[in-house]
Curated annotation (Swiss-Prot):
<dbReference type="GO" id="GO:0015459">
    <property type="term" value="F:potassium channel regulator activity"/>
</dbReference>
<feature type="propeptide">
    <location>
        <begin position="28"/>
        <end position="33"/>
    </location>
</feature>
<dbReference type="InterPro" id="IPR050098">
    <property type="entry name" value="TFPI/VKTCI-like"/>
</dbReference>
<dbReference type="GO" id="GO:0090729">
    <property type="term" value="F:toxin activity"/>
</dbReference>
<feature type="signal peptide">
    <location>
        <begin position="1"/>
        <end position="27"/>
    </location>
</feature>
<comment type="function">
    <text>Serine protease inhibitor that inhibits trypsin (Ki=0.281 nM), kallikrein (Ki=337 nM), and chymotrypsin.</text>
</comment>
<keyword id="KW-0722">Serine protease inhibitor</keyword>
<feature type="site" description="May bind Kv1.x/KCNA">
    <location>
        <position position="39"/>
    </location>
</feature>
<comment type="similarity">
    <text>Belongs to the venom Kunitz-type family. 02 (native) subfamily.</text>
</comment>
<keyword id="KW-0646">Protease inhibitor</keyword>
<feature type="disulfide bond">
    <location>
        <begin position="60"/>
        <end position="81"/>
    </location>
</feature>
<dbReference type="InterPro" id="IPR020901">
    <property type="entry name" value="Prtase_inh_Kunz-CS"/>
</dbReference>
<keyword id="KW-0732">Signal</keyword>
<feature type="site" description="Reactive bond for trypsin">
    <location>
        <begin position="47"/>
        <end position="48"/>
    </location>
</feature>
<dbReference type="InterPro" id="IPR002223">
    <property type="entry name" value="Kunitz_BPTI"/>
</dbReference>
<feature type="disulfide bond">
    <location>
        <begin position="37"/>
        <end position="85"/>
    </location>
</feature>
<dbReference type="Pfam" id="PF00014">
    <property type="entry name" value="Kunitz_BPTI"/>
</dbReference>
């Protein structure tokens, strides 16, 4: 592979990064944080049974969390869920 092709590939990847990076930053983010309240409930991959709360788009609802994995849309109490996710 010639130097011209390598430089062209580097230039292409650099432009692609500059164009797509702002979109990646703004998708599902609020105040610079990932908007975990928009994620679905996720039990995780383990088999434990912890009662947690998640935001379903309208309100906070209970779900059973397996104890590991999952995502950030899980809260130990309804109050914590509402504080983080409910819109005033």
């Amino acid at each position: 592979m010639g130097i011209a092709r390598i430089l062209s590939a580097v230039l292409f990847l650099s432009v692609l990064f500059v164009v797509t990076f702002p979109a990646l930053l703004s998708a599902d983010h609020h105040d610079g944080r990932i908007d975990t309240c928009r994620l679905p409930s996720d039990r995780g991959r383990c088999k434990a049974s912890f009662e947690c709360w998640y935001f379903n788009g309208r309100t906070c609802a209970k779900f059973i969390y397996g104890g590991c994995g999952g995502n950030g849309n899980k809260f130990p109490t309804q109050e914590a869920c509402m504080k983080r996710c409910a819109k005033a």
